[in-house]
Amino acid sequence: MARGPRYRVPFRRRREGKTNYHKRLKLLKSKKPRLVVRKSLNHHIAQIIVYNPKGDRTIVSAHTRELIRDFGWKGHTGNTPSAYLLGLLIGYKAKKAGIEEAILDIGLHPPTRGSSVFAVLKGAVDAGLNVPHSEEIFPEDYRIRGEHVAEYAKALKQEDETLYRKQFGGYLVKGLEPEKLPEHFEEVKAKIIEKFEGARE
């Protein structure tokens, strides 16, 4: 362990890999609400947070569990399609709460082009939330719709149905054939839009 008068112990959250304080300061200087996106292996969570000296205040939040509970999502809740739908949901919630713009905060997640955290951003932007971004960071549309999953599932089923049922058991037990994920994605997307905008002709 380092010793001596020049050695400074990093803040606890920095040591635990939870907060990049240099990056956080830059975000706070924008004085805009933050669209905070975090992910785990099986879920994503998004929040609109505003800075408060006594503690950050959460305006609205959304969790991928809501996609299952409120909109009938049957796909995986940690993939790109569900991340986009979560972004759409948090975007509409933010607009309803009077939030028109925000700045993206992905914490310590690496800013990898096309990653699921940027699928959340894409959904929020499509809902009408103004967040500075570059179009190049978004996942391709076919990945957002889950077409890559559907194509892989179709090929795997033809090659090894036992492995297909094992790998996509989570989909099948919910009554969704993974080959039909893009259609299911569009159905759930339409439900979210209808809830906040009303039925579209």
From Swiss-Prot:
InterPro entries with a match to the protein in the record: Rbsml_uL18_euk
GO MF annotation list: 5S rRNA binding; structural constituent of ribosome
Entry superkingdom: Archaea
Gene3D superfamilies for the chain: 3.30.420.100
GO annotations of cellular component type: cytosolic large ribosomal subunit
SUPFAM superfamilies: Translational machinery components (SSF53137)
One of the GO BP terms on file: translation
Keywords recorded for this protein, A-Z: Ribonucleoprotein, Ribosomal protein, RNA-binding, rRNA-binding
Coiled-coil residues: none
One Pfam short name: Ribosomal_L5e
Keyword Mitochondrion among UniProt keywords: no
Family affiliation: Belongs to the universal ribosomal protein uL18 family.
Annotated PANTHER family: LARGE RIBOSOMAL SUBUNIT PROTEIN UL18, RIBOSOMAL PROTEIN L5-RELATED
Subunit structure: Part of the 50S ribosomal subunit. Contacts the 5S and 23S rRNAs.
The protein's role, per its UniProt record: This is one of the proteins that bind and probably mediate the attachment of the 5S RNA into the large ribosomal subunit, where it forms part of the central protuberance.
Protein name in the entry: Large ribosomal subunit protein uL18
Organism whose genome encodes this protein: Thermococcus gammatolerans (strain DSM 15229 / JCM 11827 / EJ3)
